[in-house]
A protein has these predicted regions:
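Asp-based, Mg2+/Mn2+-dependent phosphohydrolase catalytic module
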Residues: 1-4, 114, 118-219
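N-terminal helical cap/lid subdomain that shapes the substrate entry/recognition surface
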Residues: 2-94, 98, 115
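Short helix-capping segments at alpha-helix termini
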Residues: 31-38, 102, 124-128, 157-158
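Residue-level marker of alpha-helix boundaries and capping positions
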Residues: 46, 86, 108, 162-164
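Substrate-recognition element of Asp-dependent hydrolases with the DxDx(T/V) motif
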Residues: 73-74, 95-122, 132-133
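Residue-level marker of regulatory loop/turn positions in helix-turn-helix DNA-binding domains and
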Residues: 88, 109, 141
Length: 219
């Protein structure tokens, strides 16, 4: 195999969480608090605004939410995260299982909490990763810091060139570049031209399907 270790993002790479949780909770909030704005946000437009200028700007500048209202919206999100398990993308479990069966290492580097990542893997019957770097680690070590990859290399006696990062967004790309690892953009979760254009221009690989990830790491 070309790579000895795959570092997987979680949201929109392994599980369809933006569509099923983040966007869904946002729409639920709007339906209750600002129903006239629901029509303004498709899933793709929501993801584009998350990419740029960012979710805080969306809430504060575009929707004009006060700090109190932002806290209220967050409660909707927390309720969805705690009570709903996002669906894993078809074929991702088989890739993880076969890669590990061949001696590969599967790591997760995500801005989700470790307990939710573990739950999602278990409920979707995915093989458990070897190590998880979630939101629980110190702030300075989270993506886009290269710390996760450097720690992996030390733990498993790897060089960065033996590591492939798979992520749908820029923090994962920045982490990979800072550590000297290759980066594959996970382009199967949504169709947002601005994100795709950026990722195609900067990534080592741009993958439009889980099947393409399989070809890259197993064939």
């Amino acid at each position: 195999m070309k790579y000895k270790c795959i570092v997987l993002d979680h949201d929109d790479t392994v599980v369809d969480s933006s569509r099923e949780i983040h966007y869904a909770s946002f729409i639920a909030y709007l339906e209750d608090r600002m129903p006239e704005r629901v029509k303004d946000y498709t899933f793709e437009s929501f993801m584009q605004k998350n990419f740029h200028p960012g979710v805080i700007s969306l809430f504060r500048d575009e929707l004009g939410l006060s700090e109190e209202e932002m806290e209220r919206e967050e409660k909707y999100w927390v309720e969805f995260v705690e009570t709903r398990v996002p669906t894993a993308y078809e074929g991702i479990g088989e890739i993880i299982a076969e890669f590990r069966a061949r001696g590969g290492i599967i790591a997760v580097a995500s801005h989700s909490f470790k307990r939710y990542i573990e739950r999602d893997y278990e409920k979707n019957r995915l093989p458990a990763p070897d190590i998880i770097y979630g939101w629980d680690i110190p702030k300075e070590n989270r993506k886009p810091s290269p710390w996760c990859i450097l720690d992996l290399c030390e733990r498993y006696n790897l060089s960065p060139s033996e590591v492939l990062v798979v992520d749908d967004l820029k923090p994962g790309f920045d982490m990979a570049r800072a550590a000297g690892a290759d980066f594959a953009a996970a382009g199967w979760a949504y169709n947002v031209p601005e994100i795709e254009s950026y990722m195609r221009a900067h990534s080592d690989y741009y993958l439009t399907s889980v099947a393409e990830l399989r070809q890259l790491v197993l064939e």
